[in-house]
Structure formats: structure tokens, C-alpha cells
Amino acid sequence: MFKLSVLKTSCPSCLRGEFFAFILKRILSQSPERGNDKQLFFLALSFYTRLPHPQSLDYKQLPQAAVYLPLIGWLTGGICALVFYLADLLWPQATAAILALIAGILLTGGLHEDGFADVCDGFGGGMNKQRILEIMKDSHIGVYGLLGLLLLLLLKISVLAAMPTSSVPLVLVAGHSISRLPPLLLMQRYDYARGNDSKSSGAVYKPNFRELIFATVIALLPLALLPALSAPAIIPVLLATVFLGHYFYRRIGGYTGDCLGASQQVAETVFYLSVSALWIFI
């Protein structure tokens, strides 16, 4: 049994922050893998970013490290936010937004953007499952991928450039964190589309309920820093995830790593668009 101490503040953002922190503490304290958390986090850091990490890691546990994707989003989003803040002191907001996006791509090695481009190529040019998977496996980018990636980046830049300047850093942190939850939801709901025909199938992992709750809390925590009206922005993100999951399942019977990367990019962009639209009413 436990009880929640009385919150002695009238600030809505503070209340939300303390509530999420309390829930996170409870989840962490009950995690059966508690002693392994540091190892999994550094595995996630090594795979999903280009940031320095310990060299002595057990990569057999790499699939389970996906649970820490939202926490990686805190890190990449925080660095992008810092880049935006510093760049905005010297240049126009649109330039600062571009530099923040460049920072994000450099931090992750363009991992998710590459997945999005491959999905555009595969689903744009493939007429059946086999052909779609073949195209996505090709390392070369095609017309669909190039156009899709270009339009996606332009959309992000235009939305971030139109937001209130002081709010963009927090939106970047929230966007990077929340957008890394959809890949986990797809992994839990659907099967790996390549089956046993790919060496990558050994990296397939289905998060359990507790891991999903943990990842969800981590992903949503940054929302506590934004105005209360921003909370509904998570709904379009979830709807987009449901749509993508159904679309992937209908076309190829599940997901691939590229599909997961694409879901992150779509979710991030949808979140920015949703927050921007909601703030019209503030």
C-alpha cells in the first residue's frame, strides 16, 4: 500500500510534473529488471544515437533496449532544444529550426529519417509484399523516398518556425520523446513482416505490459512542461499510429525496422502540427 502526499502547489504544470514523477518512481521501484536498467539504456544509446557510450555492452540484450526509446528522445530532444535556443539568439527562427533538425539527424545518424524514406520508396513503388520488402532493403533512395523526406522536413521547419519562439525548445523535447512511443506500440501489436527470411528477425521483441506502461510514462512526461491545452495533441499521434499499423499490416502483414522509423517520423511531425493547431485557442 502507498499513498500520494498532498501537493502544495496550485501550478497545473507543477501538479502534472509531480504526478508523472510519482508514477515513474513507482514503476521503476517495481521493475523486475531493475538491476539491468543501466545496461539496457546504454545499449539503446549505442544503437539509436551516435553519442559516446561504454564499449563493454552485451548486444544480445539489444532488442529489449527499445523500451528506452522515449528516454533517448529526452536526450536527443534536449540537445536539439539547446541548439535551437542558441541559434535563435543569432539568426531567424526558421534558421534555428533547420539547425535543430540537423542536430537531430546528426545525433541519430538519420536512422529514423532513413526508415521513412525507405517506406516511401517501398510502399510507393511496390505492388506486392515481396516487392515492397525488396525495395525497402535496397540502400539506395528513390524518387518517392526523396520527395517524401523533403516534404516531411519542410513541414517540420514551417511548423516550428511559426510557433512562439520561447515554446519551441519544450515542444522539441516533447516531440522527440512522444514520437518514440509509436514504434513500441507497433512492435507489441504486430509481427515482424520478414518472418524467418531475414537475419534481422532475431532482433524482434514484443514489449510486455509493464514495459509499455514504463515507456508511456517516460514518453508523456515532457507534456507536463507545456500548456495544459497541449495534452490532446497525443490523440492525433495515436490515431496516426493506428492508421500506420493497419496500413503496414494490410500491405506486408506486419512491420519492419523501416516501418518503425517511419512511424517515429510521422508521429513527431503530427505532434508538432497538433500542438501548433491547439495553441491557436490559447
Residue ranges of each PLM-predicted region?
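Short, low-complexity, charge-dense intrinsically disordered segments
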Residues: M1-R16, F22-N36
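Hydrophobic alpha-helical transmembrane segments
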Residues: L24-L28, R34-G109, M127, D138-I282
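Glycine/small-residue-rich loop that forms an oxyanion/phosphate-binding "nest" at active or ligand-binding sites
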Residues: D114, G124-G125
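Juxtamembrane helix-boundary/capping and inter-helix hinge elements in multi-pass membrane proteins
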Residues: G125-R131
